[in-house]
Amino acid sequence: MNHFVYLMDKYGNPYSFSLKPKYYKTLVLSGGAMRGVYLLGALNGLKIKINKISTFIGISSGSIICFLLSIGYTPYEIFISLLKYDNLLTINLDKLYSGDTRNEGGLFSSENIFKHLETQMRLKEISRSITFKEHFEKTGKILIVMAFNITKCKEDIFTYETTPDMEILNSLKLSARIPIIFGPIKYNNNFYIDGGVWNNFPIDIAIKYHNKKNKKKSDWIIAVTTLFSTYKQNIHQWYKFSNINIVMVNDTPDLNPSLVSSDLEKLTMFNKGEEKASLIKKQNIRRNSI
C-alpha cells in the first residue's frame, strides 16, 4: 500500500505527503508577509492537532503565527482576528517624502502589527514582555525564531536555550523586517533584517533540531509554505527525511497580497490554503482505498 502523495515544488523537485502521522510534534512555517494567511488555511484544512505540537519554528510572518499558535490560538482564530484588524501597515509619510529611512527603518511602520499582536497576547493573559524561558515554563512549548544578522552576516536563532531572557516580541520584530518596507532594526549592537532573506523555509533547522534532540521516529514534522515563496533550490535535500510532511499551497496567480490586503483577498488566500490541504488528504485517502 502506498501511503504517500507525490507533489512538485516550483523547481520541479518532488516531495511527498503521508497520512501516516496521527499528529505532529514539530511545525515549520515559512515567511511571506500576508501570504501567511495561505498557511493558516492549510493548517485549518489539515485539521492538525495544534495542542500536540511541542516545537514551533517560524520565519518572519511565520514566526508570528507560530507564537500565536503556541499560546493557544487556532489557525481559524488567527485568521478571524486579521479580518477584524485591517490597518496593519502604517505609511511613514515624513520618511516617504524626505527619503529618511533611519530609526524604525523603511518607509513603513510595523507599530500596528505589534499592537495587534499585543492585543492577542492580552486576551490569552500573556505578558507583552514574556521571555523565551517564561514562555517555555508557561506553555511547555518550544518556540524557535530566526532573523538575519547583517552586522555579522549570519542567521541568528532565538530559543529558550540560546536566548532564555530575550523578550519574544523583540525576536519577532527582528525576524519580520521585510527589507525596504521596514528596514534594519538594532538589537544588542547588531542590525537585523527579515529572517526570510537568508532562509525563508527553515526545514533544515527543524531536522537538525530533531536529530540533536534524538527525537523518536514516530515524531513527525509538518512544514508549510506557498509554492512560489522564496526558498532555495537545494532545499530538496531535506525532502528525503523520513518523518517530514510538506505542504506547498498554490499561490493564486492573479493575487499579489500585501500587508494592506482586503478582507476579500484574505478570505481568498485562506480558502486556497484550506482547499490545497484538503485535496492532498483526499488524494492520499483515494489512493490507499484503491
UniProtKB/Swiss-Prot annotation:
GO cellular component, one term: membrane
Motif stretch (GXSXG): 58-62
UniProt xrefs under SUPFAM superfamilies: FabD/lysophospholipase-like
Active site: 60, 194
PROSITE patterns given in the database record: PNPLA
GO biological processes: lipid catabolic process
Name of this protein: Probable lipid hydrolase 463L
